[in-house]
């Protein structure tokens, strides 16, 4: 494997909020972060025992009562228990509105019926916020929390890049395989988000492709890129597009893979509508070889590291597998939950796709 500019690494930095220590106690029971509750990724420090005041921000009457209470002022040991907070973006806008109005809120506790999904944040909010399933928090009157946050304005990260030279030195253009190797990390000292499906499985696929092409050289160079910063907002791939180690115009096709651990129901091709000939080629190969039960098409989406390449005019598709238990951005996304059904067949499909690439 060769490198560009005498290094396999591309270093850069971004801001990130971290939560090195979190604890929560309800009715004398220690709650497990990641399983029983989540701390908002942008949460500041908060410590104390709080009495929960229940409101529904989607109910007009409750909303009036809420604003009346906020105008009166919350005590330092009072927290808002917000029910029916299912739409995270809508609720965040609501909280931002409360903050912009100058209300002092010691703590917000969200109650949701759907599964807990964690994320990351590049900023530190003023109002601490926790999320619980309805089943845990609905009959709770009091909560004790101790959350320590650490905002890092310039966290060092790196992309990993290498390539295999082509057999024909006169052949112009690269084929590029990409995946992100980062995930969410830790929430406190004990809650680990493994990211087996998202995206250790995609990283594994890149290594599988590199192993194959190291033994089966092509006429043209093949580049392999593992991005960091995907979970923070596609930052690694954005940085690479803005600071490319080779001309992006030389890329014949970029294939980004994510969530490759369970393809019993086939795969989906994002940007398939934008690059229909590439999608049709994948479908034609699959009809001949019967690698997968189905290949679905999707349009443009800023949901993985292909995005900024395609925005820069690079022919780019993003492939993810369909099937498996569906663990995603949670503490249950572990290696033993992946069955790797059709994993080898996805690799064979990609090899044949590149072989027939025009």
PLM regions: where:
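Solvent-exposed loop/turn segments at secondary-structure junctions
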Residues: 13-16, 85-88, 112-115, 168-169, ...
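A conserved hydrophobic secondary-structure block that centers on an alpha-helix together
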Residues: 60-104, 108-114
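Metal-dependent peptidase/peptidase-like ectodomains
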Residues: 218, 227-327
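Soluble metallo-hydrolase cores and metallopeptidase-like ectodomains found primarily
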Residues: 33, 44-52, 57-64, 111-194, ...
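Structural recognition of the beta-strand scaffold that forms the well-ordered cores
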Residues: 8, 78-82, 105-109, 161, ...
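Noncatalytic luminal/extracellular "stalk/propeptide" segments of secretory-pathway proteins
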Residues: 1-79
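His/Asp/Glu-rich mid-to-C-terminal helical/loop segments that flank catalytic regions of hydrolases
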Residues: 211, 326-358
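Second-shell loop/turn segments in exported
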Residues: 39-40, 52-60, 81-86, 93, ...
């Amino acid at each position: 494997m060769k490198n560009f500019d005498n290094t396999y690494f591309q270093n850069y930095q971004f801001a990130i909020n971290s939560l090195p220590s979190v604890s929560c106690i309800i009715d004398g029971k220690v709650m497990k972060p990641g399983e029983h509750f989540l701390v908002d990724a942008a949460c500041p420090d908060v410590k104390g025992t709080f009495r929960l005041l229940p409101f529904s921000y989607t109910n007009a009457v409750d909303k009036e009562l809420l604003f009346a209470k906020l105008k009166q002022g919350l005590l330092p040991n009072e927290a808002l228990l917000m029910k029916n907070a299912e739409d995270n973006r809508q609720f965040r806008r609501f909280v931002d509105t409360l903050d912009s109005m100058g209300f002092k809120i010691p703590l917000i506790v969200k109650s949701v019926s759907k599964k807990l999904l964690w994320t990351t944040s590049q900023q530190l909010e003023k109002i601490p916020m926790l999320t619980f399933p309805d089943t845990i928090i609905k009959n709770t009157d009091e909560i004790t929390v101790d959350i320590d946050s650490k905002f890092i304005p310039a966290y060092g990260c790196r992309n990993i890049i290498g390539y295999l030279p082509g057999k024909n030195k006169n052949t112009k253009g690269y084929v590029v395989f990409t995946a992100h190797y980062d995930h969410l990390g830790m929430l406190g000292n004990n809650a680990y988000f493994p990211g087996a499906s998202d995206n250790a499985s995609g990283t594994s696929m890149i290594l599988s492709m590199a192993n194959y092409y190291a033994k089966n050289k092509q006429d043209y160079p093949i580049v392999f890129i593992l991005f960091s910063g995907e979970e923070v907002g596609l930052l690694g791939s954005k940085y690479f597009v803005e600071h490319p180690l080779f001309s992006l115009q030389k890329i014949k096709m970029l294939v980004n893979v994510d969530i490759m651990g369970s393809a019993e129901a086939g795969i989906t091709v994002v940007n398939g509508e934008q690059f229909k000939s590439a999608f049709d080629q994948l479908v034609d190969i699959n009809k001949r070889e019967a690698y997968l039960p189905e290949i679905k098409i999707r349009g443009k989406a800023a949901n993985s590291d292909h995005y900024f390449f395609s925005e820069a005019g690079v022919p780019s598709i993003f492939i993810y597998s369909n099937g498996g238990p569906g663990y995603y951005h949670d503490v249950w996304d572990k290696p033993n939950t992946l069955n790797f059904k059709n994993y080898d067949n996805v690799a064979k499909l990609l090899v044949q796709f590149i072989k027939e690439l025009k």
